[in-house]
Amino acid sequence: MVMGPHLLLLVFILGLGLTPPTLAQNDSRYIKFLDQHYDPKTKNGNDKYCEKMMRLRNMISPCKEINTFIHGNKASIKAICGNQNGQPYNGNQRISTSAFQVTICRHIGGSPRPPCRYRATAGFRNIVIACENGLPVHLDESIFRP
């Protein structure tokens, strides 16, 4: 079956129309990733830092059990999705080849309702992320590598 030029043009235009929502969805997942896990300003979070950040990032209704904040720059985090700072890990995930300074906030206490209390663990860790179209969209874990 041979397509005429008008039909090819229609298929091309429809294809263009379907691409932006997919990219926009990936961008929104990347923005959510940054909102949940990225904090370039702090270098060494403590318990008060965790309580403040979890509240500011709206992760306290219910109290999120665990969350990791990455204290690096966006370019280095995005580079994990490529070959500059990442390598394949455990299926379709990527692990950073360099360590990032992170603060891990763990919920302490029995109730999942506010006020939420957190214990902080700060240190350098390699991070494991999922990527879509070259952007990090999910932080799976952080690994201490001596």
Swiss-Prot record:
Annotated GO MF terms: actin binding; copper ion binding; DNA binding; endonuclease activity; heparin binding; protein homodimerization activity; RNA nuclease activity; signaling receptor binding
Location in or out of the cell: Secreted; Nucleus; Nucleus, Nucleolus; Cytoplasm, Stress granule
Cystine pairs: C50-C105, C63-C116, C81-C131
InterPro entries reported for this sequence: RNaseA, RNaseA-like_dom_sf, RNaseA_AS, RNaseA_domain
Name this protein carries in UniProt: Angiogenin
Keyword presence, Nuclease: yes
Gene Ontology CC annotations of this record: angiogenin-PRI complex; basement membrane; cytoplasm; cytoplasmic stress granule; endocytic vesicle; extracellular space; nucleolus; nucleus
Keywords in alphabetical order: Angiogenesis, Cytoplasm, Developmental protein, Differentiation, Disulfide bond, DNA-binding, Endonuclease, Hydrolase, Nuclease, Nucleus, Protein synthesis inhibitor, Pyrrolidone carboxylic acid, Secreted, Signal, Stress response
UniProt signal peptide: 1-24
Residue positions of motif Nucleolar localization signal: 55-59
Subunit-level organization: Homodimer. Interacts with RNH1; inhibiting ANG ribonuclease activity. Interacts with PCNA.
